[in-house]
């Protein structure tokens, strides 16, 4: 067991792996990471699946079966991804049971092409939930304006949700409201809300990539001094919002009925700038009740040389506010930054989804011949 990762878990940060593949499942690697790297959750996305399915032979048998049945490419994608997610859910079921449903969660994303279609997103979430048929599943729904009512409706039906692609503080506040509204509707319908869970995936490194590009164009010493500070400041203030919202009477009523809080999940935590410490977005975002989902390279880096100095979020709220104020003074429009990132985030997942469809369409053709 890695001491840095054990220490991170002890500090209240749930360690999740941002990756999945059939090879990782079948070789026992995921189970090994659960044993030796404190991994208690898994996130996936269309990009991860496209790379996994296009890069190995472990899917060939299922592809042949699907080709023989003559299924269309959409059904094939759902069958293949659901099989991997179901197996990962089973591997992490002990963590789910041990934590009373808090951890041991595995996330599967709805078709990203539906990011701006509320009703179709809800229908897709329901279909994926039934297809995987595991209580420790999270359905990933993007935090677009159309996604917010879909999040509420999905939670109201008793389906656990990972809200993804959150960049803006005001959007995060809307996400928490959508979460509570969904639980209130579920409770009114007589559901046991203790079984309905959620995380809010707040993206980190992409904020620095966008802001640092704008700072480079400004080019002043003050702008240079603010490089690689925006993302951490933004995330820290998100946690402050989390503390505020989940101490309100509204939340206390839900908690009394058995609800679990919607934990902040730090996503996009690998550093894009090679000049930065490779564990930066882990070390600087430590606080109780959070999740950090890491690609394997970041996970192994933290296992090797990560440091847990204690809570690195709550003592730094004023510094975080100062960073965002200085960015505004320099002319960096954070509202525009987060809007650009949301549009790009949806587009990137749509592109990966289309590549995934192309990959499976090609492999179905090869398997049938």
Curated annotation (Swiss-Prot):
The protein in question is named Transaldolase
What GO cellular component entries does it have?
A: cytoplasm
- The scientific name of the source species is Parafrankia sp. (strain EAN1pec)
Q: Which GO terms describe its molecular function?
A: transaldolase activity
Q: Which InterPro entries match?
A: Aldolase_TIM (IPR013785), TAL/FSA (IPR001585), Transaldolase_2 (IPR004732), Transaldolase_AS (IPR018225)
- The EC designation for this entry is 2.2.1.2
The catalytic activity, as recorded, is: D-sedoheptulose 7-phosphate + D-glyceraldehyde 3-phosphate = D-erythrose 4-phosphate + beta-D-fructose 6-phosphate
Quick one: which pathway?
Carbohydrate degradation; pentose phosphate pathway; D-glyceraldehyde 3-phosphate and beta-D-fructose 6-phosphate from D-ribose 5-phosphate and D-xylulose 5-phosphate (non-oxidative stage): step 2/3
PANTHER family, alphabetically?
TRANSALDOLASE
One Pfam annotation reads TAL_FSA
Q: Where does the record place it? A: Cytoplasm
Give the protein's function: Transaldolase is important for the balance of metabolites in the pentose-phosphate pathway.
Q: Superkingdom, according to UniProt?
A: Bacteria
As for family, the record states:
Belongs to the transaldolase family. Type 2 subfamily.
């Amino acid at each position: 067991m890695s001491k840095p990762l054990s220490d991170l878990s002890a500090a209240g940060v749930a360690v999740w792996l941002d990756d999945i593949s059939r090879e990782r499942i079948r070789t026992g690697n995921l189970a090994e990471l659960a044993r030796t790297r404190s991994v208690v959750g898994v996130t996936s996305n269309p990009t991860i699946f496209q790379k996994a399915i296009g890069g190995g032979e472990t899917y060939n048998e299922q592809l042949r079966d699907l080709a023989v049945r003559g299924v269309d490419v959409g059904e094939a994608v759902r069958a293949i991804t659901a099989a991997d997610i179901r197996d990962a859910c089973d591997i992490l079921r002990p963590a789910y049971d041990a934590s009373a449903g808090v951890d041991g969660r595995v996330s599967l994303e709805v078709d990203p092409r539906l990011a701006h279609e509320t009703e179709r997103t809800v229908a897709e979430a329901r279909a994926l939930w039934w297809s995987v048929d595991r209580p420790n599943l999270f359905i990933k729904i993007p935090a677009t304006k159309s996604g917010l009512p879909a999040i509420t409706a999905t939670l109201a039906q008793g389906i656990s949700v990972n809200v993804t692609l959150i960049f803006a503080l005001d959007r995060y506040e809307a996400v928490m409201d959508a979460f509570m509204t969904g639980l209130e509707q579920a409770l009114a319908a007589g559901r046991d809300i203790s079984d309905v869970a959620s995380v809010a995936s707040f993206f980190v490194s992409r904020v620095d990539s966008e802001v640092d590009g704008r700072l480079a164009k400004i080019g002043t010493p003050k702008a240079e001094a603010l490089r690689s500070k925006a993302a951490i400041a933004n995330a820290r203030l998100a946690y402050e919002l989390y503390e505020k919202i989940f101490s309100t009477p509204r939340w206390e009523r839900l908690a009394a009925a058995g609800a679990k809080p919607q934990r902040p999940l730090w996503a996009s935590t690998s550093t894009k700038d090679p000049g930065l410490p490779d564990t930066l977005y882990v070390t600087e975002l430590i606080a109780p009740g959070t999740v950090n989902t890491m690609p394997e390279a970041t996970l192994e880096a933290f296992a090797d040389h990560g440091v847990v100095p204690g809570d690195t979020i709550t003592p730094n709220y004023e510094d975080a506010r100062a960073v965002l104020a200085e960015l505004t003074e320099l002319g960096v429009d954070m509202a525009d930054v987060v809007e650009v990132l949301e549009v790009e985030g949806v587009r990137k997942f749509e592109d990966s989804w289309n590549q995934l469809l192309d990959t499976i369409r090609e492999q179905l053709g090869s398997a049938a011949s």
